[in-house]
Amino acid sequence: MPGLDSPAAVRRAAMDLLAR
């Protein structure tokens, strides 16, 4: 899972949760 090793993906996921 490259997403776990990608800080950008993690940041994007956090923004997605905050945008909810």
Curated annotation (Swiss-Prot):
Keyword Nucleotidyltransferase among record annotations: no
Location within or outside the cell: Cytoplasm
Cystines in this chain: none
GO cellular component: a single term: cytoplasm
UniProt keyword terms in alphabetical order: Cytoplasm
Superkingdom of source: Bacteria
Cytoplasm as UniProt keyword: yes
Similarity comment: Belongs to the RecX family.
Functional note: Modulates RecA activity.
Protein name per UniProt: Regulatory protein RecX
Record organism: Azotobacter vinelandii
Lineage: Bacteria, Pseudomonadati, Pseudomonadota, Gammaproteobacteria, Pseudomonadales
Gene: recX
